[in-house]
Amino acid sequence: MAGKTYINNRDNDLSEGLKQLASYLNIPTGVIQAFKSECFVRRYNKGQIIYYSSDQPTYVYLLLDGIVLRETINEDGDAYRKLNKEQLLFPLNHLFRKIELNEMCTAITPCNVIGIPKDMLEYLCKNHDDIFVTLFEKLNNELELLMEYNMALTTKLARERIEKVLYYLCHAIGYDQDEFYEIKHIMTIQLLSDLAGISRETTGHIVHELKEEKKLIKNGKNWMVIK
């Protein structure tokens, strides 16, 4: 009986995951229902690796909930970090490409993902123009965020760089609460220091200044950034 319950729960999780995928792609669930047996839903604890480099090059993933850190390594060994929250399909830049993906994805909070065969999504793109257009728009949004982060890193003044990286985080993983952005569960001075490439001590001083100026409110790892 316990085994049957587990199978039913897993099937329900997969069905719900497919509904979220269909909503993300802006298509009826029936379009992807036929591929249900080829997909999977998994839960990852904080710190677990979801994929590393070309371990699973045949899948792309929709983050159903939680926050992940993706680190891409180029030919020179430089690492590029990206933080993503729920309702994001990744790695989109792996679609229609045969090259190895030098990327590691780690769960920063507990999270659930649905894995979708890469060739299945490519097939759907080729046969449904609206899916291709949707994914193209999503990829452009991701590239715009990456450009915002890269531009923040080119800023020479420490305070200005910290502020710009904070706003990048607001746009990437924050929640718009009208008068402020809220970044939940993960924010620390060390994380901000790492992402900005500025010492922890300097980052701490700047964060203190922002708090004094009422531009930032900290509640543990939940940070509120005033617009």
UniProtKB/Swiss-Prot annotation:
DNA-binding region ranges: 189-208
Subcellular localization(s) per the UniProt record: Cytoplasm
Transmembrane parts of this sequence: none
Function: Positively regulates the expression of the arcABDCR operon under anaerobic conditions, thus playing an essential role in arginine catabolism. May also control the expression of genes encoding proteins which are involved in anaerobic metabolism. Can bind cyclic AMP.
Domain called HTH crp-type: residue spans: 156-227
Domain of life: Bacteria
GO molecular function: cAMP binding; DNA binding; DNA-binding transcription factor activity
Binding-site residues for a nucleoside 3',5'-cyclic phosphate, renumbered to this chain: 41-130
PANTHER family to which the protein is assigned, alphabetical: CRP FAMILY TRANSCRIPTIONAL REGULATORY PROTEIN, HTH-TYPE TRANSCRIPTIONAL REGULATOR ARCR
Gene3D superfamilies from the UniProt entry: Jelly Rolls, Winged helix-like DNA-binding domain superfamily/Winged helix DNA-binding domain
Xref: CDD domains: CAP_ED (cd00038)
Name of the protein in its database record: HTH-type transcriptional regulator ArcR
GO (cellular component) term, any one: cytosol
InterPro entries in the cross-refs: cNMP-bd_dom, cNMP-bd_dom_sf, Env_Response_Regulators, RmlC-like_jellyroll, WH-like_DNA-bd_sf, WH_DNA-bd_sf
Main location: cytoplasm
Record keywords: Activator, cAMP, cAMP-binding, Cytoplasm, DNA-binding, Nucleotide-binding, Transcription, Transcription regulation
